[in-house]
């Protein structure tokens, strides 16, 4: 039976209901009809697509995505690979049934150079709309610290990732009705990305496409140089991969591209591309408990007034 993917990214409580019927990013035919997809993949179909797409140039992968996947967006922190994807999209010479807009997660802890780059990208690609999502209920780093505590990333990094990145991403997917996203992940970045497929389906049913999965860091840099693409000034100061200022360091020439992220820690991903975090599981459990208590109270009230 074909595997079904949600047409909307579910909320935390909704994901809890779907979790038991989900395996390796696929939702069984018994899951809620509320999330009937516009696209249906079987597992063999997804495997077939990856075998075919891995031999295509990134521009051809993007061309396939734009013409085949509805509600397609690009998620980016404006790293080099994301900038290359953006430039390639702007140059596709095909009738485009949809614009591929950007989703940028402003954690409120980016380097000033990163925010300057966002402005430069807007000027260079004026037709490209950037949807900016911030941690819920705050607009500045000071407000974030006041609400969640100083240096939260040191006290509870999973909670920080959830508040600053994962929840805003999931909120963006729901509000924008995202079905598929382009990411800047590549195999040469190492870590968990070493065996990356071109196209994936995450455990919530979101399609993720990694068009430059086969490219090296040098190939990405060369494209940026040849096409005069604006990039983060920190890359000229020893950085290769840039995230939040508190978890990003310069790297040596022989070090891996992402070795400057969370240096000295076993951590390699911020949570957006990981399975749902323990904190997310905690939130779902708390929501389930709240609903059970509300139901129990409602029944008690009904018995009292009967």
Curated annotation (Swiss-Prot):
InterPro entries with a match to the protein in the record: PAPS/APS_Rdtase, PAPS_reduct_dom, PAPS_reductase_CysH, Rossmann-like_a/b/a_fold
Lineage of the organism: Eukaryota, Fungi, Dikarya, Ascomycota, Pezizomycotina
EC top class named in words: oxidoreductase
Entry EC no(s): 1.8.4.8
Catalytic activity: [thioredoxin]-disulfide + sulfite + adenosine 3',5'-bisphosphate + 2 H(+) = [thioredoxin]-dithiol + 3'-phosphoadenylyl sulfate
Pathway(s) per entry: Sulfur metabolism; hydrogen sulfide biosynthesis; sulfite from sulfate: step 3/3
Region ranges (Disordered): 1-30, 245-266
Listed name of the protein: Phosphoadenosine phosphosulfate reductase
Similarity comment: Belongs to the PAPS reductase family. CysH subfamily.
Superkingdom classification of source: Eukaryota
Cited NCBIfam families: cysH, PAPS_reductase, PRK02090.1
